[in-house]
A protein has these predicted regions:
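Beta1/beta-strand and adjacent pyrophosphate-binding region of the FAD-binding site
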Residues: 3-15
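An anion/pyrophosphate-binding glycine-rich loop and adjacent beta-alpha core
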Residues: 36-38, 190-329, 426-509, 517-522
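Conserved N-terminal/central alpha/beta ligand/cofactor-binding core
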Residues: 21-125, 147, 159-176, 183, ...
């Protein structure tokens, strides 16, 4: 039976959900395929959303019109802001989320979205035809399911997660499976290979889930969450959090006994017995890998985190392993407070197929296959937030292409999402890629609190940001501008300022000062000058945060914006997709070959490709007549 839609999304994990919602909300007929309707937006690893740089991604997804932030807000068990000891640019929100409630909410959102159908079926084949449309050699025209259905489509987005030829490892036992023991996707990898797509093999893992009532929490350190915090999403009413109880997490440490057990049995780990060939995540190593890489450390910190309000399962962050079940019990019970612990789900490692992301444009469309997109762990990343961010962009661009409109390409200077995609498509990755604030050279500009200012207008132009969201954004923007002006123009006399400063252990004022001048001082913030601000208006917390932070870091931001402007002309200069690099005189052979293979869309992307140096860029600019 042949069926028809405009956009097909393969896989309903965090990438697939955002891709399908973006496409459908932009008015495009969309079908989302999943191997199990019960595993939509699953969190097979840590039950949390956000973290260092990841929190920034969630705010950016929300600013563009995505869904992750709102759903995370509604199921928050605990919220914390990381990196508070550092500058505001790297403050990152992280929430413990109720895993099952998150899935239920996301499934409900999908079911209620117009232009979107959900179907439980496995996609086993991508159907393509040859095309004369440069620079593509093929065009996607449909997909086939394991049930024999053919769905014709204009675009398809692959969000396969860790399901493609997935294989689980526990000690010397291994078997084909997706995460959580779900079925793996067997046929799709062969179809991708047949279409000339290069695949890689990556690995990740997850710790055991332990029964809460068998842990002696009196022996663990308690980690409380924040009582006063801002939501991820513009949609979330702050009243939702007023009567919620913060569920605590706990901290425990490995010890010498734990380490001896692991060392004595490390030969039984699938990682070290030669069974696993895939590359694992550098920034989320297994416990046995930690002992090998950090042999001098006497202990490792572990976090004991709730999986949900209505389950006994506790997640032991930092304790992932592929050791056999008997060793898992032995090392777990060596921990303080875990002497009688019972495992509900065993830890495992999982190996899976993914692509070399340099095969993609910054739109996340395959360079050789028109209308075929990739997103999420399928593109070589790790993490729910990285996946959701890519899914959103792939969904937007698939919808825009279907409607004959220009794609959305986010710059490094305007978003972490742009940085993530630029890194993947120009540099590639040889290990699961994780977003970090240090990956952005423009991080002073990319705060969590100004994500809407940076990206909501882009989402609006693309047709994803709703009227309600845009109206709320404009109102907030106006409030911020008014408050900044008020702080800049409200002056405190020299006498009052001196009295205030001396009481705070500071030198006396040399003249009258504005409230903004005081905020710019390193020792003061908005709350600390309240006694001088007698006519302070009652404003929302998010308005206060952005207004005061803008003022405090204005000097640094101005310098970084000047740097962005300096490189903007060359950075965004487009490169013809059919440019013949191999015949550009003066271009080194290595550079020409790399450029010909990766086909960058802009001069900025070309400059970041490994093997392309500044002299090569100069040759390219002269050839294009830019210099």
């Amino acid at each position: 039976m042949e069926l028809k839609t405009q956009v097909v999304v393969v896989g309903a994990g965090h990438a697939g959900v955002e891709a399908a919602l973006a496409s459908a909300r932009m008015g495009v007929d969309t079908v989302l395929f999943t191997m199990s309707l019960d595993s939509i937006a699953n969190m097979p690893c840590n039950p949390s959303i956000g973290g260092t740089a990841k929190g920034h991604l969630v705010y950016e997804i929300d600013a563009l019109g995505g869904e992750m932030g709102r759903s995370a807000d509604l199921v928050t068990l605990q919220s914390r802001t990381l990196n508070l000891g550092k500058g505001a640019a790297v403050h990152s929100k992280r929430v413990q989320a109720d895993r099952r409630k998150y899935q239920q909410i996301m499934k409900s959102v999908l079911e209620k979205t117009q232009n979107l159908r959900l179907i439980q079926a496995e996609i086993t084949e991508i159907i393509t035809v040859e095309t004369a449309e440069p620079p593509y050699s093929k065009r996607v025209v449909g997909v086939k399911t394991s049930l024999g259905e053919t769905w014709n489509c204009d675009a398809a987005i692959i969000c396969g997660g860790t399901f493609l030829n997935g294989r689980i490892f526990v000690g010397d036992v291994s078997y084909p499976a997706g995460p959580d023991g779900l079925l793996d996707a067997k046929g799709l990898s062969d179809s991708l290979l047949a279409n000339g797509i290069k695949l890689m093999r990556f690995k990740t893992g997850t710790p055991a889930r332990v029964k809460k009532s068998t842990i002696d929490f009196s022996q663990l350190e308690i980690q409380e969450g924040e009582t006063d915090f801002l939501p991820y999403s513009w949609k979330t009413d702050l009243a939702h959090f007023e009567n919620r109880t913060n569920v605590p997490c706990h901290i425990v440490y490995t010890n010498e006994k734990t380490h001896k057990i692991i060392r004595d049995n490390i030969h039984r780990s699938a990682m070290y017995s030669g069974q696993i060939h895939g590359t694992g995540p550098r920034y989320c190593p297994s416990i046995e890998d930690k002992l090998v890489r950090f042999a001098d450390k006497e202990r490792h910190q572990l976090f004991v985190e709730p999986v949900g309000e209505n389950t006994e399962e506790m997640y032991i962050q930092g304790f992932s392993t592929s050791l056999p079940t008997d060793v898992q019990y032995e090392m777990l019970r060596s921990l303080k407070g875990f002497e009688n612990a019972e495992i509900m789900r065993y830890a495992y490692a999982i190996e899976y197929d993914c692509i070399d992301p340099t095969q993609l444009y910054a739109t996340l469309e395959f360079k050789e296959i028109s209308g075929l997109y990739g997103a999420g762990q399928f593109n070589g990343t790790s993490g729910y937030e990285e996946a959701a961010a890519q899914g959103l962009i792939a969904g937007m661009n698939a919808a825009l292409k279907t409607n004959g409109k220009e794609p959305v390409i986010l710059n490094r200077s305007e978003s972490y999402i742009g940085t993530l995609i630029d890194d993947l498509t120009t540099k590639g990755t040889n290990e699961p890629y994780r977003m970090m604030t240090s990956r952005s050279e423009y991080r002073l500009l990319l705060r969590q609190d100004n994500a809407d200012e940076r990206l909501t207008p882009i989402g609006r132009r693309a047709g994803l940001v709703s009227d309600d969201q845009y109206a709320k954004f404009l109102a907030k923007k106006e409030e911020i501008a008014k408050e900044k002006e008020r702080l800049e123009t409200t002056y405190i006399s020299k006498e009052k300022a001196t009295e205030f400063l001396i009481n705070k252990g500071q030198d006396p004022a040399k003249s009258g000062v504005s409230l903004a001048d005081l905020i710019r001082r390193p020792d003061f913030d908005y709350d600390q000058i309240a006694e001088l601000d007698v006519d302070r208006p009652s404003l929302p917390k998010d308005v206060i945060l952005t207004a005061s932070t803008d003022i405090k870091y204005a000097g640094y931001v101005k310098r970084q914006l000047a740097e962005v402007k300096k490189y903007e002309k060359i950075e965004s200069k487009p490169l013809p997709r059919d440019l013949d690099y191999l015949n550009i005189k003066g271009l080194r052979i290595e550079a020409a070959q790399k450029l010909d293979k990766l086909k960058p869309l802009t001069v900025g992307q070309a400059s970041r490709i490994s093997g392309v140096n500044p002299a090569d860029i100069s040759v390219l600019l002269i050839y294009l007549g830019i210099k």
